[in-house]
Protein backbone atom coordinates (compact mmCIF):
# COMPACT_ATOMS: atom_id res chain seq x y z
CA UNK A 1 0.00 0.00 0.00
CA UNK A 2 1.36 3.43 -0.95
CA UNK A 3 0.58 5.01 2.42
CA UNK A 4 2.94 2.61 4.20
CA UNK A 5 5.92 4.16 2.42
CA UNK A 6 4.87 7.62 3.54
CA UNK A 7 4.86 6.67 7.22
CA UNK A 8 7.67 8.74 8.78
CA UNK A 9 7.99 6.34 11.70
CA UNK A 10 8.91 3.51 9.32
CA UNK A 11 11.27 5.77 7.42
CA UNK A 12 12.88 6.93 10.65
CA UNK A 13 13.34 3.35 11.83
CA UNK A 14 14.83 2.45 8.45
CA UNK A 15 17.32 5.32 8.55
CA UNK A 16 18.14 4.75 12.22
CA UNK A 17 18.84 1.09 11.41
CA UNK A 18 21.14 2.12 8.58
CA UNK A 19 22.93 4.55 10.89
CA UNK A 20 23.32 1.87 13.57
CA UNK A 21 24.66 -0.60 10.99
CA UNK A 22 27.32 1.87 9.85
CA UNK A 23 28.22 2.77 13.42
CA UNK A 24 28.50 -0.90 14.38
CA UNK A 25 30.81 -1.41 11.38
CA UNK A 26 33.03 1.42 12.61
CA UNK A 27 33.09 0.11 16.19
CA UNK A 28 33.93 -3.40 15.00
CA UNK A 29 36.70 -2.33 12.63
CA UNK A 30 38.27 0.16 15.05
CA UNK A 31 38.85 -2.48 17.74
CA UNK A 32 42.55 -2.62 18.50
CA UNK A 33 43.36 0.18 16.05
CA UNK A 34 45.54 3.02 17.25
CA UNK A 35 45.91 6.47 15.69
CA UNK A 36 49.08 5.55 13.81
CA UNK A 37 47.52 2.44 12.25
CA UNK A 38 44.49 4.43 11.14
CA UNK A 39 46.78 7.05 9.64
CA UNK A 40 48.95 4.44 7.87
CA UNK A 41 46.13 2.24 6.58
CA UNK A 42 44.56 4.19 3.73
CA UNK A 43 41.92 1.54 3.03
CA UNK A 44 40.79 1.48 6.67
CA UNK A 45 40.76 5.27 6.89
CA UNK A 46 38.78 5.65 3.66
CA UNK A 47 36.34 2.98 4.80
CA UNK A 48 35.77 4.70 8.15
CA UNK A 49 35.31 8.09 6.51
CA UNK A 50 32.89 6.61 3.98
CA UNK A 51 30.82 5.17 6.83
CA UNK A 52 30.80 8.56 8.56
CA UNK A 53 29.53 10.14 5.34
CA UNK A 54 26.79 7.51 5.11
CA UNK A 55 25.79 8.09 8.73
CA UNK A 56 25.43 11.79 8.03
CA UNK A 57 23.53 11.28 4.78
CA UNK A 58 21.05 9.03 6.56
CA UNK A 59 20.79 11.39 9.52
CA UNK A 60 19.72 14.14 7.11
CA UNK A 61 16.84 11.91 5.97
CA UNK A 62 15.34 11.58 9.46
CA UNK A 63 12.08 13.43 10.00
CA UNK A 64 12.06 16.66 11.97
CA UNK A 65 9.96 14.85 14.58
CA UNK A 66 12.59 12.14 15.01
CA UNK A 67 15.39 14.71 15.20
CA UNK A 68 13.45 16.59 17.86
CA UNK A 69 12.74 13.42 19.85
CA UNK A 70 16.45 12.54 19.72
CA UNK A 71 17.79 16.05 20.16
CA UNK A 72 20.33 14.81 22.73
CA UNK A 73 22.21 13.17 19.86
CA UNK A 74 24.82 15.23 17.99
CA UNK A 75 23.03 15.27 14.61
CA UNK A 76 24.38 18.70 13.61
CA UNK A 77 27.93 17.70 14.52
CA UNK A 78 27.63 14.51 12.46
CA UNK A 79 26.38 16.45 9.47
CA UNK A 80 29.13 19.03 9.93
CA UNK A 81 31.72 16.25 10.19
CA UNK A 82 30.49 14.88 6.86
CA UNK A 83 30.71 18.29 5.24
CA UNK A 84 34.29 18.66 6.42
CA UNK A 85 35.24 15.22 5.07
CA UNK A 86 33.59 15.77 1.70
CA UNK A 87 34.49 19.39 1.06
CA UNK A 88 37.89 19.68 2.76
CA UNK A 89 39.22 16.12 2.62
CA UNK A 90 42.89 17.10 2.38
CA UNK A 91 42.71 19.21 5.52
CA UNK A 92 40.90 16.78 7.82
CA UNK A 93 42.65 16.54 11.20
CA UNK A 94 43.27 12.82 11.62
CA UNK A 95 43.65 13.11 15.38
CA UNK A 96 40.06 14.40 15.57
CA UNK A 97 38.92 11.66 13.19
CA UNK A 98 40.59 9.02 15.36
CA UNK A 99 39.12 10.39 18.60
CA UNK A 100 35.67 10.54 17.02
CA UNK A 101 35.82 7.03 15.60
CA UNK A 102 37.40 5.41 18.63
CA UNK A 103 35.60 7.13 21.49
CA UNK A 104 32.55 9.12 20.35
CA UNK A 105 31.04 6.69 17.86
CA UNK A 106 30.71 3.76 20.34
CA UNK A 107 28.85 6.06 22.73
CA UNK A 108 26.56 7.12 19.89
CA UNK A 109 25.78 3.49 19.11
CA UNK A 110 24.80 2.87 22.72
CA UNK A 111 22.57 5.95 22.72
CA UNK A 112 20.89 4.92 19.47
CA UNK A 113 20.18 1.42 20.74
CA UNK A 114 18.57 2.89 23.87
CA UNK A 115 16.53 5.42 21.88
CA UNK A 116 15.42 2.94 19.24
CA UNK A 117 14.16 0.50 21.86
CA UNK A 118 12.21 3.35 23.45
CA UNK A 119 10.59 4.27 20.12
CA UNK A 120 9.12 0.81 19.55
Residues covered by each model-derived region:
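Solvent-exposed interaction patches of small proteins and small membrane subunits
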Residues: 1-120
Amino acid sequence: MVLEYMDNTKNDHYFLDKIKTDIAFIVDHMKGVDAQELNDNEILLDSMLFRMIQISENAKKLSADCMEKTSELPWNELIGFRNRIVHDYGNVDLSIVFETLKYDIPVLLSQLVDIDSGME
